[in-house]
A protein has these predicted regions:
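Glycine-rich segments within core transmembrane alpha-helices of 12-TM secondary carriers
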Residues: 22-41, 230-238
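A late C-terminal transmembrane helix in Major Facilitator Superfamily
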Residues: 218-251
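Helix-to-loop junctions at the C-terminal end of transmembrane segments
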Residues: 150-162, 246
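Cytoplasmic helix-loop-helix junction between adjacent transmembrane helices
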Residues: 1-32
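Juxtamembrane intracellular "pre-TM" segments in multi-pass secondary transporters
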Residues: 79-103
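Helix-loop-helix hairpin linking two adjacent transmembrane segments in secondary transporters
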Residues: 29-76
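C-terminal transmembrane helical hairpin of 12-TM major facilitator-type secondary transporters
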Residues: 164-208
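Extracytoplasmic gate region of multi-pass secondary transporters
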Residues: 98-141
């Protein structure tokens, strides 16, 4: 619950304090720290576990979170957009906004693809290739590394290239990555494919949230919440669907399902720009 609120509110805050030219870049920079945490924290915890007990590490984690809270208490945040309270009528009306729903369903598939990659890639590589489990996990790490590096690069690219062009190119890059996985790859090809997938998925959240923040500036926090809830539903449903289909047919369908999902995202994005 806390993580979901933090995710939504930090994105909304960055969108609110950024002008139109900077919004995509700043949201991308914010998203890069997700990847840095995903890569760095497990390594840090593994290192600390050699010297400290689980209880000490957990207490230390709590202290770090408390320091973060105390730091935020001293920050001067922007004034509320709705000083008289939450506009229930306007907020509920967002659920009828076709533009918001189209953009949210792009995140539905984006979040679903990320979740499926994290949960099914190692099984796919284990059953369709001769790659050992430890190297399959390393290939999966390549996806997070690709996503993190790409988001850092996007901070610069968004200032020079239209975000619509960046998103289309990124999704096609992810399609190429999944295509590499369909050829029963060795480790090198699998790792390259996963880097391309991570890099290809990097721009979706920054671009879509930037557009939502611009179109629904007066209710950006609520609009972001709608989009992120739909995204989380997508992660759950696509994971379940992958499990059902892989049991009925074979895990070999996994990359093809992801390619179809990416093509749907491209179609939804094209429609959302009209």
């Amino acid at each position: 619950l806390g993580g979901g609120i933090l995710n939504g509110e930090t994105n909304a805050l960055v969108a609110d304090i950024s002008n139109e030219a900077e919004k995509g870049s700043r949201l991308s920079l914010l998203g890069a720290f997700y990847g840095i945490g995903a890569l760095g924290i497990p390594v840090l915890l593994s290192f600390l576990s050699e010297y400290y007990s689980f209880e000490i590490i957990l207490q230390g984690t709590g202290m770090v979170m408390l320091i973060g809270i105390l730091f935020c208490l001293g920050i001067r945040f922007p004034a509320p957009k709705q000083p008289q309270g939450f506009p229930i009528k306007e907020g509920s009306g967002l659920l009828k906004e076709s533009s918001l729903l189209l953009l949210s369903f792009i995140l539905f598939f984006q979040s679903g693809i990320e979740g499926v990659c994290n949960n099914w890639t190692t099984l796919y590589l284990g059953q369709t290739t001769s790659i050992p489990e430890n190297r399959a996990l390393l290939a999966l790490t390549c996806m997070v590394a690709g996503l993190t590096v790409a988001r850092l690069l996007l901070v610069v690219l968004f200032k020079k290239i239209k975000q619509e062009t960046v998103l289309r190119t990124s999704l096609i890059t992810a399609v190429v990555g999944f295509t590499l996985l369909t050829f029963a790859p060795g480790f090198a090809r699998a790792a390259i494919g996963m880097v391309l997938i991570g890099a290809g998925l990097a721009s979706t959240f920054p671009v879509i949230l930037s557009i939502i923040g611009s179109r629904y500036a007066s209710l950006s926090g609520t609009a972001f919440s709608v989009a992120l809830v739909i995204a989380l539903i997508g992660q759950t449903l696509l994971n379940s669907l992958t499990g059902i289909i892989s049991q009925g047919y074979s895990i070999v369908v996994y990359p093809y399902m992801m390619i179809v999902s990416l093509l749907i995202m491209l179609l939804l994005f094209k429609r959302s720009l009209k």
